[in-house]
Amino acid sequence: MANPFKDQSKFMKACGQTVNERNEAQYKLYCDLIDEEFNDEFKLALANNDRVEQLDALIDILVVTIGAIHSGGFDAEGAWKEVMSTNFAKIDKETGKVRKREDGKVLKPIGWVAPNLKSFVK
C-alpha cells in the first residue's frame, strides 16, 4: 500500500527540500500552495463539474499539505495515528456506527478526548 508521507518525503528530498525539520520559508510556500490548490484549482473544478480535475486538485491538496507537515518539522505519521485513534473513539462499540448531525457531521460522544499532538511537534 502507498505511504503518502514517505512518498512526499522522497519527492521533497529529490527537490532539494528539507524534510522533518522546521523550515519556515518552505513551510510558508507549502501553506500558500494549499490555499492555491483549494481556492484556484479545486473550486474551479467544482464549478466546471470536472471530476477528473477535482480528483487532481484533491490529490495535489494532499501532496502540498503533507509537504507543509514535513516542512513544519512535525511527526506526520505519529500525529496521523493519534488523530485517527481519537476519530475511531467516536465509533459506538455496540452499534459500530457514529452519531451524526442532520448535515452529516460526526458528533463527539460523551467522554471523548481530543488528540494530544504536543509530542508530534518538533
Residue ranges and their predicted role:
Residues 1-58, 62-122:
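Flexible "arm" and connector segments at domain edges
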